[in-house]
């Protein structure tokens, strides 16, 4: 069950931005940046764990560390989730794809289980 809090938009510092962007048909964003992942790759190799899972875990931890990325509009209210999960496509043996839901976890071993 998702836990969240409702943000009081009357006193919210981001209210003006929210008012402007909520008028858009699809108020979302995408982010593409180069990431130096060699150390993470070496860490995964040393630990004999999946680089993909370790990178996904690191990205989810980073996203959860930014309150604004945990915020959503729901029933005309702004809410902030305590924690985010992630859904990602994973290739199957037959080269098809399956969507996999991954809950946030405090430790990588629990995340990758």
Where do the model's predicted regions map?
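Short polybasic amphipathic segments
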Residues: 87-90
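Basic, often amphipathic N-terminal segments
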Residues: 12-17
């Amino acid at each position: 069950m998702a836990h969240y809090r409702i943000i009081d938009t009357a006193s919210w510092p981001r209210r003006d931005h929210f008012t402007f962007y909520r008028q858009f048909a699809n108020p979302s964003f995408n982010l593409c940046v180069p990431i130096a992942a060699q150390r993470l790759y070496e860490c995964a190799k040393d630990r004999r764990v999946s680089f993909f899972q370790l990178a996904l875990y690191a990205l989810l931890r980073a996203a959860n560390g930014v309150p604004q990325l945990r915020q959503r509009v729901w029933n005309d209210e702004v809410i902030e989730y305590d924690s985010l999960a992630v859904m990602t496509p994973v290739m199957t043996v037959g080269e098809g794809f399956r969507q996999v839901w991954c809950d946030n976890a405090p430790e990588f071993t629990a995340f990758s289980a």
